[in-house]
């Protein structure tokens, strides 16, 4: 029995975009992907500033100090409170094993996979996105062979929530392309 889902269009926001990039590079998918839409997508490892590197170094030092047995006995919640203050909301809410996974995933650079994406790709980016900067979208547009980038003004990482009317118009236009509608 063959699997035929019909027309397949994948849409992913942030981490979902990362999943699509990996999926599009997987050999032997049981279906063809007609189009992809990456919205404020993750996947490009950011260039780390000196400020960021110092923050990581200070976090590791604090983690070592707060994890020291006598300190842990005196201040049992100090390390967890520090983690919650320093990390993202996702990181703070995650279990210890999931935290390790998050760190590995966030640091994985998928740039080399972009040029292998064969499906037409729409990239939608909030101009003010700080989680996955617009520069990432511009790089993806250059590297994905059949990609176009739409920049949404007055929007950040959740461009589809911050500018829903514009976002929906862009979606409708892309989805109707080549259908003669």
Positions of predicted regions on the chain:
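Catalytic histidine neighborhood in serine/cysteine hydrolases
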Residues: 141-158
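Flexible "cap/lid" loop of the alpha/beta hydrolase fold
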Residues: 18-26, 31-68
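Conserved alpha/beta-hydrolase "nucleophile elbow" surrounding the catalytic nucleophile
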Residues: 8, 12-17, 126
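Catalytic histidine-centered segment of alpha/beta-hydrolase-like enzymes
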Residues: 155-169
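Short beta-strand/loop motif that positions the catalytic acidic residue
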Residues: 116-117, 123-125, 129
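Conserved acidic catalytic loop of the alpha/beta-hydrolase fold
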Residues: 1-8
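Conserved alpha/beta-hydrolase "acid-adjacent" motif
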Residues: 130-136
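Conserved alpha/beta-hydrolase catalytic His-Asp/Glu region
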Residues: 38, 49, 64-119
């Amino acid at each position: 029995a063959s699997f035929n889902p019909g027309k397949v269009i994948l849409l992913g926001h942030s981490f979902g975009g990362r999943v699509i990039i990996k999926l599009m590079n997987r050999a032997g998918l049981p279906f063809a992907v007609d189009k992809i839409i990456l919205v404020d997508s993750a996947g490009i490892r950011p260039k780390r500033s000196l400020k960021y590197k110092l923050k990581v170094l200070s976090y590791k030092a604090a983690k070592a100090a707060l994890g020291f047995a006598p300190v842990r006995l005196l201040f049992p919640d100090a390390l967890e409170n520090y983690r919650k203050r320093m990390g993202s909301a996702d990181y703070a809410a995650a279990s210890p094993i999931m935290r390790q996974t998050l760190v590995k995933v966030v640091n994985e650079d998928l740039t080399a996979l972009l040029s292998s994406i064969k499906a037409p790709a729409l990239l939608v980016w909030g101009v003010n996105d700080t989680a996955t900067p617009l520069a990432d979208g511009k790089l993806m547009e250059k590297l994905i062979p059949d990609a176009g980038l739409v920049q949404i003004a007055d929007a950040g990482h959740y461009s589809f929530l911050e500018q829903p009317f514009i976002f929906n118009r862009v979606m409708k236009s892309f989805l109707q392309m080549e259908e003669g509608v």
